Design a protein with these regions (language model features):
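SAM-dependent transferase fold signal centered on methyltransferase-like domains
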Residues: 1-103
Length: 103
């Protein structure tokens, strides 16, 4: 396992030796970090809007964790997070605790 840091979030993940693939224990694609940065900038630029956000194929949950930590207060009304991997509930709970995010 490796401790990965992306902006304000730290994740403990097992990374593949080569390319990212769907058979990973928990999916995380570091190349998409810039897309997550843009999403946070965009959502923070929307004025006076409490949003309902869905992240149905969350993988490691990095996008949702960053939303919870980096979006301005009051931006999120509800955040729905899920993934098909069997160990996702355990993983997201551990990462919420690791990053001191109250669920």
């Amino acid at each position: 396992m490796s401790l990965i840091t992306e902006h304000s979030i730290a994740l403990n993940l097992t990374l593949p030796e080569k390319d990212v693939h769907k058979k990973m224990e928990v999916f995380y694609n570091p190349v998409m970090a810039s897309h997550r940065n843009i999403a946070i900038l965009l959502l923070n630029s929307i004025e006076n809007k409490a949003m309902n956000i869905a992240d149905p194929l969350a993988g490691s949950g990095i996008r949702s964790l960053r939303f919870l930590k980096e979006l301005k207060k009051g931006k999120i009304n509800h955040l729905f997070v899920n993934d098909m991997k069997e160990n996702f509930p355990k993983t997201i709970k551990e990462n919420l605790q690791r990053n001191k995010i109250k669920n």
